[in-house]
Swiss-Prot record:
This is tRNA (guanine-N(1)-)-methyltransferase. Its EC number is 2.1.1.228. The keyword Transferase applies. It catalyses: guanosine(37) in tRNA + S-adenosyl-L-methionine = N(1)-methylguanosine(37) in tRNA + S-adenosyl-L-homocysteine + H(+). One of its GO terms (biological process) is tRNA N1-guanine methylation.
Length: 270
């Protein structure tokens, strides 16, 4: 997977290239990062990449030409590696919400070109000509797209085969389909007792089925309390078992649903 980033601050991306899980994956050749500064594609002595907005208003707007030239250079470099043209994604508060599914889709692809905006915004003509999708992390505004781009990259790289030391680690992440799209359960490590708080007995039992049921119950409890819409989604997808539904009924103080495994007795004919 190759990631190209168009940014005024290429040095910010040393974090994902050199450190932690993403840094190790980069060193192993599981993915590559290439940063392109629009200032390198300007033609004036001041390397200007922004100007005042037409129609007035506060702030400055990033100019179309340097951005488009940077994108073309990135796509040409990809072509030189015999890679197909990549989607061009703009980090933007008006974009589609980036989630675990989008991260998995990116991890399964050849990569993309990320555009990190600054100032008041980007010239709309560049967006119309070059951008194929817009991505948002949520309903808030950052000073630039770099922090959002780092999150997009990190979420995808850790899903690459071999990126994590334990291949099953990503399968236990919150939102993963192996957890039925639910939130992850709490985690504990040594010491067994910390500030008078003990590790739950189920985790010390050594009984694998009991541990799995405890983790599933905690996942259901946490998801119901924090993200109830994920419960609805899991139910719609058919990802909840009868045991799950019984746990949820108990948590909500309602009567458990009938067991679908038990056939209803037919009334004798009169």
């Amino acid at each position: 997977m190759r990631i190209d980033v168009i940014t005024l601050f290429p040095e910010m991306f040393g974090v994902v290239r050199d450190l932690g899980v993403t840094g190790r994956a980069h060193a192993q050749g599981l993915w590559s990062l290439h940063a392109w500064n629009p200032r390198d594609f300007t033609t004036d002595v001041h390397r200007t990449v922004d100007d005042r907005p037409y129609g007035g208003g506060p702030g400055m707007v990033m100019m179309a030409a340097p951005l488009e030239a940077a994108v073309k250079a990135a796509q040409a470099a990809r072509a030189a590696q015999h890679l197909p043209p990549a989607p061009v994604a703009l980090l933007s508060p008006v974009g589609r919400r980036y989630d675990q599914g989008a991260a998995q889709q990116l991890a399964s692809s050849d990569g993309l070109v990320l555009i990190c905006g600054r100032y008041e915004g980007l010239d709309q003509r560049f967006i119309d000509r070059c951008v194929t999708l817009e991505i948002s992390l949520g309903d808030f505004v950052l000073s630039g797209g770099e922090i959002a781009a780092l999150a997009v990259i990190d979420a995808a790289v850790r899903l690459l085969p071999g990126a994590l030391g334990d291949g099953d680690s990503a399968l236990q992440d919150s939102f993963n389909d192996t957890l039925s799209g639910l939130l992850d359960s709490p985690h504990y490590t040594r010491p067994e007792v910390y500030e008078d708080q003990a590790v739950p007995a189920e985790l010390l039992s050594g009984h694998h089925a009991r541990i799995a049921r405890w983790r599933r119950d905690q996942s259901l409890r946490l998801t119901l309390a924090r993200r109830p819409e994920l419960i609805d989604r899991a139910r719609t997808q058919g990802w909840l078992s009868y045991a799950d539904e019984c746990v949820l009924a108990e948590l909500q103080g309602v009567v458990a649903p009938p067991d679908p495994r038990k056939k209803r007795r037919r009334k004798p004919a009169a």
